[in-house]
């Protein structure tokens, strides 16, 4: 009778320790720290952020107008409106 009780007690103790260790290791993996020395400035990540916002949208609008040889006339990020001028670039 003593052997099953000791075995179950030991099993509960081991299972609680392993769950604690697993939770501790997964918390370490989820921790993110930003330090300029360990992760230097990346201009490509900044470029991705700008493409999402207003500056990026109007920049793409201006590039599209320049490819057509026109000036940018209107850029509205809220309405997603990009208009080029009628006259060509001289």
Curated annotation (Swiss-Prot):
Region annotated PRK6 binding, chain positions: 67-87
Keyword annotations from UniProtKB, A to Z: Disulfide bond, Glycoprotein, Secreted, Signal
InterPro entries: DEFL_AtLURE1-like
Compartments where found: Secreted
Effect in UniProt of substituting residue 83 to A: Compromised interaction with PRK6. Reduced pollen tube attraction
Disulfide bridge positions per record: 58-75, 61-82, 65-84
Consequence recorded when altering residue 73 to A: Reduced interaction with PRK6. Normal pollen tube attraction
Outcome recorded upon mutating residue 67 to G: Compromised interaction with PRK6
Tissue expression pattern: Expressed in the pistil. Detected exclusively in the synergid cells.
Span of the signal peptide: 1-19
Entry annotated with the keyword Signal: yes
Outcome (variant: residue 70 to G): Compromised interaction with PRK6
GO biological process per UniProt: pollen tube guidance
A single GO cellular-component term on record: extracellular region
Glycan-modified residues: 23
Subcellular location, principal: secreted
Result, substituting residue 79 to A: Reduced interaction with PRK6. Normal pollen tube attraction
Top-level taxon: Eukaryota
Functional summary from the UniProt entry: Pollen tube attractants guiding pollen tubes to the ovular micropyle. Attracts specifically pollen tubes from A.thaliana, but not those from A.lyrata. Triggers endocytosis of MDIS1 in the pollen tube tip.
Family per record: Belongs to the DEFL family.
Subunit structure: Interacts with MDIS1, MIK1, MIK2 and TDR/PXY, but not with MDIS2. Binds to PRK6 LRRs.
Name this polypeptide is given: Protein LURE 1.2
Source species of the chain: Arabidopsis thaliana (Mouse-ear cress)
């Amino acid at each position: 009778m003593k052997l099953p009780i000791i075995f179950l007690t030991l099993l509960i103790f081991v299972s609680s320790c392993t769950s604690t260790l697993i939770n501790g290791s997964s918390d370490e993996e989820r921790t993110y720290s930003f330090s300029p020395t360990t992760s230097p400035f990346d201009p490509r990540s900044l470029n991705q952020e700008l493409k999402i916002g207003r500056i990026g949208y109007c920049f793409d609008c201006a590039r599209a107008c320049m490819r057509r040889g026109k000036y940018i006339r209107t850029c509205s990020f809220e309405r997603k409106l990009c208009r080029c001028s009628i006259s060509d670039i001289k």
